[in-house]
Amino acid sequence: MISVNLASLPIVEDMINRKEDLNIEVIKLENGATVLDCGVNVMGSFEAGKLFTKICLGGLAHVGISISGSLDNKLVLPCVKIKTSHPAIATLGAQKAGWSVSVGKYFAMGSGPARALAMMPKATYEEIDYKDEADVAILCLESSQLPDENVADHVAEKCGVDVSKVYLLVAPTASMVGAVQISGRVVENGTYKMLEALHFDVRKVKFAAGIAPVAPVIGDDLKMMGATNDMVLYGGRTYYYVKSDEGDDIENLCKSLPSCSAETYGKPFLDVFKEANYDFYKIDKGIFAPAVVTINDLRTGKLMSYGETNVDVIKKSLKFSQL
């Protein structure tokens, strides 16, 4: 079986070798673990964001960035593009932010290959029938703080590997790399909703592709959380090849997937978050989805699409002004 950790290791090694070119910093902790700072004390870069995203996806996706990406020629933004032939494993088995890493005063949302070793969360891996048994653990952390030896020891213990084989990549939400990797979740937003909200067997998704604009760095982590989510919710477009079974209602799946199916659709995400008193659990989970979903049903040959991009909300979210 494919190992998302082993598939990602050469990408990590490439980042280490190109640290100056990528504007990142590599730190060797006293216990032997390796930390890649991709935006805490460094600038980072689009290329670092691309590689960070590819690692989040377990090395099982092609990731590209188009600087000339546009939405209806009304607002020009960089766009990140994702393609994967292993959608369930890459997005839910690796990229999903399914590990809340809390050690002492340190907290970060963890995603990427190491989750498949720690089985975080176990239910997801049972649903997609996947596990990894690599001897190296690679975890991507969304945090404005760098992890220390205690965090690395915790990850090593949960993953069952020697701490010297732990690699921790860190990028704050309010950073170039952070913005790229969150927009790079455009495909995962769809597969996550398929599984968690619509209870569709994501193993039937045989190929997936997506594109989403990348948010400019407009403020602190809270402001960027709003902006980065809006890039996917109102600008993300996805394409799924699904091999359905007889009895699967793929048209209903397609209509139910996009963010426009949520009651809170039409507002910038930060406004929705404020209205929920900053409590994620009070937010309609249906909003966490791409703006447009296109599905090709391989069994019936049907092609269908639902949803639309909403440039006006993106402009409002970014407080954009045309000079």
UniProtKB/Swiss-Prot annotation:
<keyword id="KW-0963">Cytoplasm</keyword>
<comment type="pathway">
    <text>One-carbon metabolism; methanogenesis from CO(2); 5,10-methenyl-5,6,7,8-tetrahydromethanopterin from CO(2): step 3/3.</text>
</comment>
<dbReference type="InterPro" id="IPR003209">
    <property type="entry name" value="METHMP_CycHdrlase"/>
</dbReference>
<dbReference type="GO" id="GO:0019386">
    <property type="term" value="P:methanogenesis, from carbon dioxide"/>
</dbReference>
<keyword id="KW-0484">Methanogenesis</keyword>
<comment type="function">
    <text>Catalyzes the reversible interconversion of 5-formyl-H(4)MPT to methenyl-H(4)MPT(+).</text>
</comment>
<dbReference type="Pfam" id="PF02289">
    <property type="entry name" value="MCH"/>
</dbReference>
<comment type="similarity">
    <text>Belongs to the MCH family.</text>
</comment>
<keyword id="KW-0378">Hydrolase</keyword>
<dbReference type="GO" id="GO:0006730">
    <property type="term" value="P:one-carbon metabolic process"/>
</dbReference>
<dbReference type="GO" id="GO:0005737">
    <property type="term" value="C:cytoplasm"/>
</dbReference>
<dbReference type="GO" id="GO:0018759">
    <property type="term" value="F:methenyltetrahydromethanopterin cyclohydrolase activity"/>
</dbReference>
<protein>
    <recommendedName>
        <fullName>Methenyltetrahydromethanopterin cyclohydrolase</fullName>
        <ecNumber>3.5.4.27</ecNumber>
    </recommendedName>
</protein>
<keyword id="KW-0554">One-carbon metabolism</keyword>
